[in-house]
Amino acid sequence: MSYPTLRLHPRKEESVLRFHPWIFSGAIATFSAPVEDGDLVSVVDSKGRPLGTGYFGGGSIAVRLLSFDAEEIIDRAFYKRRLEAALRLRLSCNLIRPVDSSDSPNTTYRLVHGEGDSLPGLIIDIYDRTAVVQAHSLGMHQVRQTIAEVLWEVFAEAGDPVLPLEGVYYKSETTLPTRDMRELTSDGFLIGHTEAAPIYENGVRFTPDWLKGQKTGFFIDQRDNRALVAHYAKGRTVLNAFCYTGGFSIYALHAGAKRVDSLDSSAKAMYLTEQHVALNFGADCPRHHSVTEDAFDYLERMPEGEYDLIILDPPAFAKHRKVLRNALIGYRKINSIAFKKVAPGGIVFTFSCSQAVSKEEFRLAVFTAAAASGRKVRILHQLTQPVDHPINIYHPEGEYLKGLVLYVE
């Protein structure tokens, strides 16, 4: 099958030859025919040598390459191969553990993580028997029904421990790159139907909200880091700032924390947290307290030594590099307060989910905050996203989640 051909300027093929899946608009010299957003295109170098095939987009990232094999046809069979490969990876990591598993059950995971699974522009999260599909490009939006059908087929054929799907929900109203694109779609089930129901994450229960929740309904990317919080939480007094659904709080309570305070400015977030506390511990859990307040204000006014484990997991302070300076100021500020206020011998978990902030920039912001506190601070762990959010080694931009665990004397 032939697609319109996009020819690059001289020497602009170097990143593609290193298997980077993005081609920027400034690298393009000519088109063999008119193309529109979402069209499949063949990419060649300045001498006409084939480089691969991908979806065209009108933004600064002009092409997201699906294949570096110019002969590979992008069809239903292509998507099935990619989804089967993604599922094999999750199975090889022992991520899929049903409720009757002798190990702690885990029925939620990310099946497709964009470039990390060689499907740029596509996210698929699994919540028990529900798959939530999210497109970040018009090309993926246009094949959403094909993806849903192939996904249904792959899960039906997989066998234990993979559960056949009962619903594939499409959630892209807020993720397509332009307003015009977003107006082309509405969220809803592509196949089947399910109702929100509790899932298991490492034996801990949560109820994702794919209808109204952020991302696809739950923050799966912090699973491993929540488990690490549990490792340190026993007997401690914990503050979970920017708690959203309360994931860190629930793990800390399960681990035997003396007290956990969940902090968020959103009343809806506090409702979700309290629902998850009740799901795991019943309607009355005297070790848990909810605080609905701006996190910066609360951190400023809380007494020194009140907590000996503080978790800082704010929303993205910078979605693009233009606001990077303000983001770094924000990271320095919250970490500086935490370092000053945490009890001696306390632990601080601090995170950035901003792709625009590099690992080095985040670490420098935390270092600056530590220096300003005047306390002795040591790094215990350097954190990132879990194995079901794989990072394509040729696409370092895929490493968006950064975290540090720090011991403060």
Predicted feature locations:
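Conserved SAM-binding loop of SAM-dependent methyltransferases across substrates and taxa
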Residues: 245-258
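Conserved class I S-adenosyl-L-methionine
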Residues: 235-244
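Non-catalytic accessory regions of SAM-dependent methyltransferases
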Residues: 1-122, 126-128
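Conserved SAM-binding motif I beta-strand of class I
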Residues: 259-264
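Mobile active-site "lid"/loop adjacent to the S-adenosyl-L-methionine
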Residues: 292, 308-337
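S-adenosyl-L-methionine
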Residues: 268-311
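C-terminal catalytic and target-recognition region of SAM-dependent MTase-like enzymes
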Residues: 306, 333, 347-409
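Non-catalytic substrate-recognition/targeting regions of SAM-dependent transferases
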Residues: 112-125, 141-219
